[in-house]
Amino acid sequence: MDFSDDDMIDNKSGEENYSYGGGNESDDYNDVVDTIIPSEKSYVILKEEDILKLQRDDIERVSSILSLSQVEVIVLLLHYNWCVSKVEDEWFTDEERIRKAVGLLKEPVVDFNGGEKDKKCRKVNIQCGICFESYTREEIARVSCGHPYCKTCWAGYITTKIEDGPGCLRVKCPEPSCSAAVGKDMIEDVTETKVNEKYSRYILRSYVEDGKKIKWCPSPGCGYAVEFGGSESSSYDVSCLCSYRFCWNCSEDAHSPVDCDTVSKWIFKNQDESENKNWMLANSKPCPECKRPIEKNDGCNHMTCSAPCGHEFCWICLKAYRRHSGACNRFVVEQAESKRALLQSEIKRYTHYYVRWAENQSSRLKAMRDLEKLQSVQLKELSDNQCTSETQLQFTVDAWLQIIECRRVLKWTYAYGYYLQDLPKRKFFEYLQGEAESGLERLHHCAENELKQFFIKSEDPSDTFNAFRMKLTGLTTVTKTYFENLVKALENGLVDVTHNEFPPDNETKSTQEKYEEYQDYEDDFLETQRLYDEALLSGCYYD
């Protein structure tokens, strides 16, 4: 099987990406990551030529074992998503069934070769099944089924399929009732070079996207892929040569030590439109007359809906104010208000975690830009002003790399904290998180603000700058230690925490009771919303 060296690779989109200048900066970043999340590298970064070699090796292996042509093997591997072992097992179990399933027929359905020995038959023209013109046998092309079509019609048919997208990889004979596969040899024979190259690109992409062992780097414009060889218990975070870090398992931004399920729930919650409905339920009530939502900021409970409605009602019980007794002590009202307060509390809790999650991501992206500026412009200025070589200034780069990775870890700990239900574990987690965050803020402030003074040329820079070097290096080391402790604890599921470590004083009991009350409510959250909506629409709170 031949592949064009000019094959291009389409990639999935990802988050904003920075290359941190040139040289070996991505290696520096990976070294910093390894200090926070120490693990053996269980993946390999693949270039396009590496992928092509792996693909050819698989094709040649199956071709040798099954004694099939490489064209036939490609059809088989495409059908089984490039799983070599499954192809071999299925083929030796029931070859006839597999041939029928993938369209590799042993005998043609239509045979125009019966008169091969008869010289007269060689001169008989054959009618094309698409344009119905007559052609000589040399102008007709067939796949394993034998249905005859002229090469011009074949070219038009296949080109259309390829232009339609990757579905062309499983293209069948043009005869509607025929399931015979169209192989790469036919495509190369009848299509133009440009079309054939596009088909080859689809085959290459299929090897990565349909297989289970390789994935593209999701960073925009990156042509690398990653082959993962770790176990299910190991971290799925990988660092591409383009400097982008992502989770190989779920293709999201790298999120260790937080698991993929938590990340998936968190991202879904952030995108879920029901959060808008929750806010409306918690912070507004429908006018009993026109049903438009009304938000009450402050003041008394006597509400007047805006024009053209003008309906006057009580904010507490929603009863028309002209029939209002001045007391709102019905149990159903108290129950509704209790649920509303619970929703408000949950919204505040979610907002607390979301804001900090988003702010750390924003700070991380800003730190990436600051590092890029430092490496591309400021290191040269700093070297000139402080009369020292750029290699002696690597500690500033290390500090920024540490900041970037710590911001990433801290960002995802807020998603972890949102779903952490065990109160003793939550206390210990928040302690570790707080220590790590405080250390990171000191490091970030030092790198961002205290470094600025040294871009101004000084007559005697050495003493002050050396003191700064020691401070920044020390903060980098301390912050790394804080985050190592945090990551290790989260990876172990905070197993070292026991309930005895946090005796249930009165305040803890109260918090526990409130938390359990919320959990009981959350288990039946959708049903509560439905009943609450029905109650509002039916007007049971103000009749």
Swiss-Prot record:
Which family is this sequence assigned to? Answer: Belongs to the RBR family. Ariadne subfamily.
Per the entry, which co-factors are needed? Answer: Zn(2+)
Name this protein carries in UniProt: Probable E3 ubiquitin-protein ligase ARI9
| Cofactor binding notes | Binds 4 Zn(2+) ions per subunit.
Print the keywords alphabetically.
Metal-binding, Repeat, Transferase, Ubl conjugation pathway, Zinc, Zinc-finger
State which pathway it belongs to.
Protein modification; protein ubiquitination
Task: Please tell me where Zn(2+) 3 binds in this chain.
Answer: 217, 222, 240, 242
Q: Which PROSITE patterns match?
A: TRIAD, ZF_RING_1, ZF_RING_2
GO BP term (any one):
protein ubiquitination
Which residues are listed for Zn(2+) 5 binding in this entry? 287, 290, 305, 309
* Disordered: annotated segments: 1-26
Ranges for the region named TRIAD supradomain are: 124-332
The record places its IBR-type zinc fingers at: 197-260
Protein task? Might act as an E3 ubiquitin-protein ligase, or as part of E3 complex, which accepts ubiquitin from specific E2 ubiquitin-conjugating enzymes and then transfers it to substrates.
CDD domains, A to Z: BRcat_RBR_ANKIB1, RING-HC_ARI6-like
Positions contributing to Zn(2+) 1 binding = 128, 131, 150, 153
PANTHER family tied to this protein: RBR FAMILY RING FINGER AND IBR DOMAIN-CONTAINING
Q: What is its EC number?
A: 2.3.2.31
